[in-house]
């Protein structure tokens, strides 16, 4: 189910069986594969790809801009594998153009803030 109050960019690609909660934000160029659950108030930022069966809990942010003072809007990415859990208030950032431009997370992980 996709809640009526969430915001989904028109360029996002979301599998039919994904659940997206109230006030969640799905940004441009986001891909969310089957079985994912995006809870209320979670944020998935641009150029982020989520594999299958991931859960993003409330107030977590995935694919935010890098926390790097040299970052100036370059096209960077965040790639998430399958079966991960991102608990409340967790933040995962995209790579930087000066280093590795793609943050890659594998499968079967638990992230907590």
Residue ranges: model-predicted function:
Residues 1-4:
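Extreme N-terminal starter segment of soluble prokaryotic enzymes
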Residues 6, 12, 18-20, 24, ...:
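A structural motif detector for beta-strand N-caps
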Residues 65-76, 96-99:
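Short, flexible, glycine-rich and Lys/Arg-enriched loop motifs at helix boundaries
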